[in-house]
C-alpha cells in the first residue's frame, strides 16, 4: 500500500471494493487492492510503472484491465465508466471512494453474484446508512431508475451461493446468520417492498 501511495500514476485512480471500505470502517481484513478509473487507460504504461515498484506478476491484461500480484499482494486496475458521486477520502496520493459509492458498487455486485463478503460489507454499511439512501446513490451512480427492482430484491434476499463461502477475516466479529437476518429486515423496511 505504501509503495502504491507514493507512485505518481496512482493519483489518476481511486481505491474501492472491500479494501476501500475496510480502510474507512475497519470491519474486516481485506488484502487486495481494486483501483478504478472512470475512463480508458493505457495498460502497458501502467504495467511499466508497476514493474518499477517491485516484483510484479501479471495475471491478466485486457483493455482497461490489469490484474496481478505486486510483492505478494493482489492488485487490480480497472476502467470503470461510472462516475464517483461523493467526495473522495485521501491517503497520501491515493483517493478512496466514499462509503456510499462503495455501497452502490456492492449493490451492483450482489445483483450480479452473491458473494458472502459483499453481503457482509453491505451489512456494515447498513449500520450507518438506510437502504433507501444507498438505493438513491445506486440510481445516481448508474444513471438508471430501479426498473428491475424485482431482480434487486431477489438478489438481496438470495444467500444460497454465499452459504458455502468462507467468512472473511473479521475485525469486528459478526455471525453470518445475523448478517442475513439484518439484510432481510432492511429490505422489508425499504421502498423495495
Question: Whereabouts are the PLM-identified features?
Answer:
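Compositionally biased terminal segments of proteins
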Residues: 1-193
Amino acid at each position: 500500500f505504501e509503495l502504491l501511495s507514493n507512485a505518481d500514476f496512482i493519483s489518476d485512480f481511486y481505491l474501492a471494493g472491500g479494501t476501500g471500505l475496510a480502510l474507512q470502517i475497519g470491519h474486516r481484513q481485506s488484502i487486495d487492492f481494486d483501483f478504478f478509473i472512470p475512463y480508458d487507460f493505457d495498460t502497458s504504461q501502467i504495467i511499466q510503472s508497476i514493474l518499477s515498484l517491485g516484483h510484479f506478476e501479471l495475471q491478466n491484461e485486457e483493455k482497461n484491465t490489469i490484474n496481478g500480484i505486486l510483492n505478494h499482494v493482489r492488485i487490480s486496475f480497472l476502467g470503470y465508466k461510472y462516475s464517483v458521486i461523493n467526495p473522495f477520502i485521501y491517503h497520501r496520493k491515493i483517493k478512496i471512494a466514499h462509503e456510499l459509492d462503495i455501497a452502490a458498487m456492492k449493490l451492483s455486485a450482489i445483483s450480479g453474484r452473491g458473494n458472502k463478503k459483499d453481503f457482509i460489507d453491505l451489512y456494515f454499511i447498513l449500520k450507518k446508512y438506510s437502504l433507501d439512501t444507498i438505493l438513491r446513490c445506486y440510481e445516481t451512480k448508474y444513471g438508471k431508475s430501479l426498473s428491475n427492482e424485482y431482480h434487486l430484491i431477489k438478489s438481496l434476499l438470495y444467500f444460497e451461493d454465499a452459504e458455502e463461502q468462507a467468512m472473511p477475516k473479521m475485525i469486528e466479529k459478526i455471525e453470518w446468520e445475523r448478517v442475513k437476518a439484518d439484510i432481510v429486515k432492511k429490505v422489508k423496511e425499504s421502498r423495495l417492498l
